[in-house]
Amino acid sequence: MANEGSDPLLQYMISPRLKKPPQLLFPLPEDNEVAIPMPMTPSEFKERLIFGPFSCSPRDSSHFIDSMKQPSPSSSSTAVNNPFSDSSTLDPLLPPPPPQPEPWLSDQTSSHCQGHALHRSKTAPAMAVINDLHHPIRQKDPTETSRSVVRQAFALLVVYLSLGVLIYWLNRDHYVVNQTHPVVDGLYFCIVTMCTIGYGDITPNSVVTKLFSIMFVLVGFGFIDILLSGMVSYVLDLQESYMLDSAKRRDEPEKRRSYIIDVKKGRMRIRLKVALALGVVVLCIAVGVGIMHFIEEIGWLDSFYLSVMSVTTVGYGDRAFKTLPGRLFAAIWLLVSTLAVARAFLYLAEARVDKRNRERAKKVLCETMSVSQFFAADIDNNGCVSKAEYVIYKLKEMEKITDKDILPISKQFDKLDRCSNGKITLLDLLEGGSGD
């Protein structure tokens, strides 16, 4: 019992209220004790912003331990007497000091906390959507945009044709024409002029009508472009999406579907687009042959001749529509067939360009890198070519991108890279958002 006075454990059990207040100076780290939480590193700060507080992190409190642990009188009295126990005195970015778990809980949680190295999954949603707070993105539905373009194109076409018919009706005596009905003749004249066919069966013979025809032709080119880029593209996109959905739903072999769908790009193959466009042109010619033979009462050969000359916008003028039903049909048929032919030529040009690009890409990927190509690919002139530099150089050789395409992207990167260290960090984005 001689050592009873010097035994600290026995003294604490006999008189716990006589315990000395905690020291204001904390033990050094070499004693394997840390009294205050260490400041977070940038990587831990980034993980905390994205994932939130980790349950097993030594800097954050464990919800599991807090729910299982019962508060003890000694710990509560220590928290009251400790002047540094108030978390409000700490930096708001630093988490509160972690509570000490019970011994029977420390063994179970140590295995989970040991070797903590979490990485954000690419498919995991962020707990704090930082980008939406500073840069809210308003996504527009592409379908609504396409529909608005179609409505605008249709409205402009109606205004264009209505104005043309009105001017023709007011000046119908100044045209050389085999008249049927003023409105039908005016609509027929407007369509033939806009589609640049020019049969020659209706011609102006005064100064006013000639000036009107000049203006009408020049404005008609713009309307053809609007119709091609608006209404026709919208209809063809709907057709393409419908065919893609139908091909995906069917239980067909992958090899058979690959002839229709480009699986890698998720679109119809260009050869199928060309075939469909040419099929529409052939259908327009066939419909024109039948209507001309039965309505205009001309022979099969002359019907086929006039149909081809009309669809291809040649229009020699030796044959034309003379009856009222024929001109009313031609007002619709010529517009549709002209747009179909124009789209077919666009698809043919796209097919040739696509074939040339595929051949060039195959040639570029098969050749090895020479010394001159190595120095050309070394963008930063550091004596080695990184993967990004190699990809950029190969894309340039394939003529998919140019320096003009890369320059605005580099300028945008320099704006985001506020530290000018060649990297964009989360702190740069936050500072950029607060600065904006």
Curated annotation (Swiss-Prot):
Keyword Plastid part of the UniProt annotation: yes
Xref: InterPro entries: 2pore_dom_K_chnl, EF-hand-dom_pair, EF_Hand_1_Ca_BS, K_chnl_dom
PROSITE patterns documented for this protein: EF_HAND_1 (PS00018)
Gene Ontology annotations of biological process type: cellular response to electrical stimulus; nonphotochemical quenching; potassium ion export across plasma membrane; potassium ion import across plasma membrane; potassium ion transmembrane transport; thylakoid membrane organization
Disulfide bonds: none
Intramembrane segment spans (from-to): 185-204, 302-321
UniProt-recorded name of the protein: Two-pore potassium channel 3
